[in-house]
Amino acid sequence: MKQYEVTGMSCAACSARVEKAVSKVPGVTSCSVSLLTNSMGVEGTATDQEIVNAVVAAGYGAAPKGAKKEQTAAEEEEALKDHETPKLRKRLIASVIFLVVLMYFSMGHMMWGWPVPAAMKDNHVAMGLLQMLLTIIIMVINQKFFVSGFTSLLHGAPNMDTLVALGAGASFGYSTYALFAMTGAQVRGDMDAVMGYMHEFYFESAAMILTLITVGKMLESHAKGKTTDALKSLMRLAPKTATVVRDGKEVTVSIAEVRQGDIFVVRPGENIPVDGIVLEGSSAVNEAALTGESIPVDKQKGSSVSAATTNQSGFLRCEATRVGEDTTLSQIIKMVSDAAATKAPIAKIADKVSGVFVPTVITIAVITIMVWLLAGKDIGFALARGISVLVISCPCALGLATPVAIMVGNGMGAKNGILFKNAVALENAGKTQIVALDKTGTITTGEPRVTDILPAEGYTKRDLMQLAADLESSSEHPLAKAVMEHAKATGISQTAVHDFQALPGNGLSAVRGEDLLLGGSISYMQQKVSVDAAMTEQAKKLAEEGKTPLLFAKNHTCAGLVAVADTIKEDSPQAVAKLREMGIRVIMLTGDNERTAKAIGAQAGVDEVIAGVLPEGKEAEIRKLREHGRVAMVGDGINDAPALTRADTGIAIGAGTDVAIDAASVVLVKSRLRDVPAAIRLSRATLRNIHENLFWAFFYNVIGIPLAAGVWYPVFGWKLNPMFGAAAMSLSSFCVVTNALRLNLFSVHGKANKKAVPAAKPTEMKISESEETKMTKTMHIEGMMCGHCEATVKKALEALPEVTSAEVSHEAGTAVVTLSSEVADDVLKKTVEEKDYKVTAID
């Protein structure tokens, strides 16, 4: 989508006019104009010049955005700055000064007996001329309304400024006529006529209308500026400079001068300037700016780093991999900006109304004046009713109802690592009825981990893991990697083996010293060693839970069982429960066999499991599910891209730095399943806000216009002074924008769910029962200084198979460890002290 800046728009009628004009250009397939950001997104083959010419012909200005490829975030932020409010504030102050003087002379002496200069006393012509002069000054100060309004009228596309210009102009024009008529009467000596014409002055109404509309415009402009705060805060994150290595020396250069392949250094406390790979050093990096996750992430050689994240502790030497508009931050900014330039389907009705709103209002005003004149009312009464209709009508409230909510909602998502690619995605996500979850990497971590260690008689857990690690050290199987990582996390160093063999039928063998080590699946090992019934039953039980049991033996004697599984993420059950609580049916898609799939599905608490689905078959399953409701597909965006595209809403989870996933309409930066219900909640809140805004905008005009026209005057005697009509108009748009800003207070994850998870399945019940036998230990630890220290200790402790969870506080200097089975204090102590912290006591 090509982006353009559009100038000269003042209301929804303007944006509708521009959109209509550009849509007619040959080669344009779609066009979306945002009054909120004064921008336009165009898709198609039309040239920039053709599009700009179409906008100019419609009476507005346009220029392509980012004409320079290396446009910095700072320049984009400058373009988003609120330049309008300061101008309006100056206009308002000047208008109020002259309005106060005008009101003093026009009403002060009559209503409150305030003194007037002797030269003015009883000199009605001089008083009228002074009022006209003061009104002209106020009209000149607010000439933008007249220039924009009448220019738009000449182009055949009247806008809100046209209504204001006609209303204030009619008041001024009729008052000027009355002034000259009064002068003629005074020359003739007809004092009764003079007094009559004096009461026909509406100079103060014209001035008050312009001033009140300026008040409303200033409030609206200020509030609109707030809606882009999230986008501007992202842009402010972009570093301005980088320290790169050139000719062996460190030099500071502007961010635009950094090129792919450059070597840059980052010291503690500095922001990382561009995306890169760590070549040297280790540190903890705070990525909250991009992901919303406050816990720092460890980085070492080979780790990727992203622009705008903060290096908290160590020195890093990195190679730039993505610079300029290719960095993760730039892609996020572009995604949020593009989404703001698109329109949600719900906005179509408002756009249709906005396109004909102003001509309709002008017609109603003319009819109102004619009807009251035919009804026998004087010209002053009829004109006041017509002017009231003009100045109370507000197309801006209609035009802003949707885009302001979309902008705020999209910004809220970006702050929480939830990226909506366009307004359609933000609207559709909230209508989801079925969520289909890919298993691997979505419900589960996507990486096998050791879950159970069951030593045979005569062996300890450490003995068994030592044997397993030694045997698996030469294997390249994914399950071997899980065993090795667990051994490393628990401080087990491998012993050298020789004569390693990967045997047919899922088995391994090697020699350690004089001992023959064997390992493999239960079926294979039963052919090699004697396995007792209890161990066989335990292996069967673990397999039913979706785990892979691995049996190990030494010298043909069974040493025990180690279970490995792709474990579900910690937040998966809570996320699934939240989705079900929201009335959404949750389905898991996986290529696993039915037994493993059902075990994982039961742990996660999904409504239905569809097993044995190959990657190419997921798209067909999504097509079937769409027959039963609106479907959101959640996956990694790689092997399930066709399914994401087929779904009503494709959600890519765990995107990390690769946020530009074409197949997905919603991108979750973090690998958190709880962000799925959060995205849907945010979408629903945004939709609700849009409905509120549209209701207010339609309700205001439906009620206000008849009241201004005097429909209720014959029945109740109600009539609306044009000044009050202008005041109402000035507040209507402000109310819509302010309501949208309430979304900033919305909590995307909501309050903690204290309701019981519905209908627990047998596997879930079993897990619940086992929790009753868990025990806790409190470790007192010295040396923890920050959140990074907490994360390091927590990660180390939770790597132990006996540890269910660890709650760590550097402020209290404690770690409360929840255990599923007994573990020696020495093991816990060693685990923490290997991370360079001191354990003083364990309760």
Predicted regions and their residues:
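Flexible metal-binding regulatory segments at protein termini and peripheral loops
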Residues: 1-128, 233, 249-250, 334-342, ...
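Conserved cytosolic catalytic loops of P-type ATPases
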Residues: 26-43, 48-49, 200-201, 232-326, ...
